[in-house]
Amino acid sequence: MTVINGIEIDCIDYKVNDIKYAIQNNDPIENKLHVLVVISNPCLYAIRYKLFNEFIRRLQDDEHIQLYVVEMIYKHQQFIVTSSSNPYHLQLKTKHPIWHKENMIQLGIRYLLPANWKAVAWIDADVEFENTTWALDTLKILNGSKDIVQLFSHCVDMAKDESTLNIFNSFGYSFSKNKAYTIKGLDYWHPGYAWAMTRKAYDKVGIYDKGVLGSGDSIIALSLINKVHINLNYQYHPDYKQSILDYQEKAKSLRLGYVPGVIRHYYHGTKANRKYVERWKILIDHQYSPFQHVTYDDVGILVPTKSFSKQFKKDILKYFKERKEDE
């Protein structure tokens, strides 16, 4: 035993890094990671297409991924980034703009992926990976070690000039490091940007897609750690709260992890214009019920029912316009 300044230096607090061991020792669950990227643009923001095209260019030469694109258009819009002749593209069209991201991911999985797929990722098209082995690392971690992973440990959130606005820890990283859950400050558990899961996990829980104003990432992440009640405003309609709690019941037993590495998040409008807090007032004002207000059409697209009021639709479109992503 060696003691210096009253501290016993041989008594170390060593924690096994199971993520590192999985990368070092596991074989990939399959040869390629199936990566879905979705885009809808009801307000035709130019920056969305620009960032999307840059994202595709960065990933198209990665030998460890198979990339798929799902594009949703509304009313009189035209398809801009997909082709009907490309077997890796899915083109969807519907009338009313609501938040379709998670619905599009699930339709991409249904219509584009091969029948024998084993791992799927869904990634926002406004990020860039600094880790050149992120896809291979993901395939290894998902081969018996984790059921679902966030594809980064840290994120550099950038301003328009690419200077640093903030640095986030990923939700999966924070959970894996046994940090205290917080939604503010330097230790904020960021639930977004990029995820992947195994086929077995997806078949069990799917992806929550009933959030017509977003927050799917947050609902999924909090469900994994049995804390989704944090996201439930007491004024929400009971049906909405119940649908989220039902998802948590399926998801809470999954093994959550992360993929080591940094991503960069590109600027597309101010955070203030996203109105992450104010937007939930729309759901409260209209007492949104996923059991009454939405259904699926013949293709599987989430669409409003007759109970979904015109004003509700207008308020959602107004929110999309107020994001002002090209500013």
Please state what every model-predicted region is.
Residues 71-117:
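Active-site-proximal specificity loops/subdomain of glycosyltransferases
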Residues 128-226, 244:
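Conserved catalytic core of nucleotide-sugar-dependent glycosyltransferases
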Residues 123-125:
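Catalytic metal- and UDP-sugar-binding loop of GT-A-like glycosyltransferases, i.e.
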Residues 1-33, 41-55, 211-327:
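C-terminal catalytic/acceptor-binding lobe
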Residues 120:
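Short aromatic/hydrophobic "clamp" motif used to bind/position activated sugar donors
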